[in-house]
Amino acid sequence: MKQNNIFFRYFSPVAAQQKLYVAALVALLSSSAYEAEAQVGEPFIHDPSTIAQCDGKYYTFGTGEGGLWSEDGWTWQGGAVRPGRGAAPDVLKIGDRYLVAYSATGGGLGGSHRGDVLTMWNKTLDPKSPDFKYTEPVVVASSLDDEDCDAIDAGLLLDPTTGRLWLSYGTYFGFIRLVELDPKTGKRMEGNEPVNIAIDCEATDLIYRNGWYYLLGTHGTCCDGPNSTYNIVVGRSRKITGPYVDNVGREMLQGGGKMVIAANNLKTGPGHFGRYIEEEGVEKMSFHYESDFRQGGRSVLAIRPLLW
């Protein structure tokens, strides 16, 4: 129980001003935060990847072929390029290259769990650069029709303590799984078997900070505009492979997870969390809203400060 009490202080709005906390809880309680988070320009995207910086610009990729880019991280426009179409990508800079993961899948909703997660590299994310060229994608995770997991919704983490590269994937229709990739090739580590780390969520993202691994997942239903019930939940663990536990001691493998981002009166369906470091001491989180009532009910990119 001692560990659970400590965890509660991290995520409880009651003690947030005294203890280390995730800012999402505080932001949700402030109507002014809803205004501040609104990106401008044409921030229209679904299932955005973690935001990556390249040559002074910001990039994020979404479901379908393409994404958004920005000069300042605030005003966004279309023009990011990602071949392969597919769903729910993620991107991570490793050394001087960018690793992009995406899914080609049935997605579970129609009864099929068949799918693949693929990875590919690029030296740059700027499509105007002479160095812009994606490598041939390789399959790193798969699921079959009768499997209790969907190979979709990739999330990448390069562990800063070990240098090991991890991929989480899966949907609400089965387990969230974790596999290890080779950070030099982006391929699945030979002999590596997937580990089940959560259920009842999708669009997972992993964070490491100060001895803890945080698993962010998206709970609820998607893809139904203003009727979407997406919300973002979190648990944490001392080990990358779990168990991930929420503030009241529930394991995410048993359906637990502390809600940290929910809908508000102007936007519904927050999902697909990503965290990026702007500079030392400055962190931000990105996600989408399934429907922004002030922008014709479209799915939009949202960015907030992430305070600890």
Walk through the language-model features, giving the residues of each:
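Secreted/periplasmic carbohydrate-active enzymes, especially glycoside hydrolases
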Residues: 1-2, 35
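Bacterial N-terminal signal peptides that target proteins for export
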Residues: 3-22
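Hydrophobic residues within membrane-embedded alpha helices
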Residues: 10-12, 27, 42
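Glycine-centered signal
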Residues: 13-15, 31-35
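Bacterial N-terminal signal peptides
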Residues: 19-31
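Carbohydrate-active catalytic/glycan-binding domains of CAZyme proteins
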Residues: 36-308
